[in-house]
C-alpha cells in the first residue's frame, strides 16, 4: 500500500516555495524514523544527521521514532553516527519504539530522551536465523551472541540497569508504557506538550 507524502508551501517576501513535509521538518532539525530499520532507511537517517551537523554543530537534532525495529547493523550505523556527531540528538518516541527502535530511543542524549503518553516501548534480544552447513550456522550463532552482548552492554549504560538485568529482561519481548520506560531508564520524560 502506498501513501501520499504531503507538500507544504512557504510564502516569503521572495515568493513561494513548496517542500515535501519531511524536507520542511528537516529545516527545523527534525528527522523522522518510521517503519522498519534497514540499510536504505539507515543511510537516509545518517545522511540527515551529518547534514544537520554541517549546518550547525551546536544546535540540537530531534529524532522522532515510530519503528518496530529492524536490522541490527543498520541500527548500529545510526547509533554510531548519533555518537560521532557534535550536536545533541534528542529522541522522541511516537507510536512505538521496539527492538532496534527502542535501542535508538535510549541512545539519545541523556536528559533529552522522550516518549509521548501512549507510546509503547519494547526491548528484546536480537533475532536471527541461519541455514547452511553446520560450520556456517556456528559462525552465525557466534556473531548473534557477540551482537547480543554489545547491545546489552550499551542498553545497560543507557538505562543505568545492570547488564545482568538487561540480559534477563530482553530474554523475551518486554513491553513498557511510556511511564514504565521512564522508570526503567530508557527515556527521561513523558511529553504532554512539545519540548521545543
UniProtKB/Swiss-Prot annotation:
Gene Ontology biological process terms, A to Z: protein quality control for misfolded or incompletely synthesized proteins
Stored Pfam families: CLP_protease
Origin superkingdom: Bacteria
CDD domains hit by this protein: S14_ClpP_2 (cd07017)
GO cellular component terms attached to this protein's record: cytoplasm; endopeptidase Clp complex
Keywords: Cytoplasm, Hydrolase, Protease, Serine protease
Catalyzed chemical reaction(s): Hydrolysis of proteins to small peptides in the presence of ATP and magnesium. alpha-casein is the usual test substrate. In the absence of ATP, only oligopeptides shorter than five residues are hydrolyzed (such as succinyl-Leu-Tyr-|-NHMec, and Leu-Tyr-Leu-|-Tyr-Trp, in which cleavage of the -Tyr-|-Leu- and -Tyr-|-Trp bonds also occurs)
Broad class of the protein's primary localization: cytoplasm
Locations listed in the record: Cytoplasm
Molecular-function GO terms, alphabetical: ATP-dependent peptidase activity; ATPase binding; serine-type endopeptidase activity
EC number(s) on file: 3.4.21.92
Database matches in InterPro entries: ClpP, ClpP/crotonase-like_dom_sf, ClpP/TepA, ClpP_His_AS, ClpP_Ser_AS
PROSITE patterns membership: CLP_PROTEASE_HIS, CLP_PROTEASE_SER
Location of the active site: 99, 124
PANTHER family recorded: ATP-DEPENDENT CLP PROTEASE PROTEOLYTIC SUBUNIT
Subunit note: Fourteen ClpP subunits assemble into 2 heptameric rings which stack back to back to give a disk-like structure with a central cavity, resembling the structure of eukaryotic proteasomes.
Role this protein plays: Cleaves peptides in various proteins in a process that requires ATP hydrolysis. Has a chymotrypsin-like activity. Plays a major role in the degradation of misfolded proteins.
Record-stated family: Belongs to the peptidase S14 family.
Name of the molecule in the record: ATP-dependent Clp protease proteolytic subunit
Gene this protein is translated from: clpP
Amino acid at each position: 500500500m502506498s501513501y501520499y507524502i504531503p507538500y507544504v508551501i512557504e510564502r516569503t517576501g521572495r515568493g513561494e516555495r513548496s517542500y515535501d513535509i519531511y524536507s520542511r521538518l528537516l529545516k527545523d532539525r527534525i528527522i523522522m524514523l518510521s517503519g522498519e530499520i534497514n540499510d536504505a532507511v539507515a543511510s537516509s537517517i545518517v545522511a540527515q544527521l551529518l547534514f544537520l551537523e554541517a549546518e550547525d554543530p551546536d544546535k540540537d537534532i530531534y529524532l522522532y521514532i515510530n519503528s518496530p525495529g529492524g536490522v541490527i547493523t543498520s541500527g548500529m550505523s545510526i547509533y554510531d553516527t548519533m555518537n560521532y556527531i557534535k550536536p545533541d540528538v534528542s529522541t522522541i518516541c511516537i507510536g512505538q519504539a521496539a527492538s532496534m527502535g527502542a535501542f535508538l530511543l535510549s541512545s539519545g542524549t541523556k536528559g533529552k530522551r522522550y516518549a509521548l503518553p501512549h507510546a509503547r516501548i519494547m526491548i528484546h534480544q536480537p533475532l536471527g536465523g541461519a541455514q547452511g552447513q553446520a560450520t556456517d550456522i556456528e559462525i552465525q550463532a557466534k556473531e548473534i551472541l557477540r551482537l547480543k552482548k554489545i547491545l546489552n552492554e550499551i542498553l545497560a549504560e543507557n538505562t543505568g540497569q545492570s547488564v545482568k538485568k538487561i540480559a534477563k529482561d530482553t530474554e523475551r519481548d518486554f513491553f513498557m508504557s511510556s511511564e514504565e520506560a521512564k522508570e526503567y531508564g530508557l527515556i527521561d520524560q513523558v511529553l504532554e506538550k512539545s519540548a521545543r
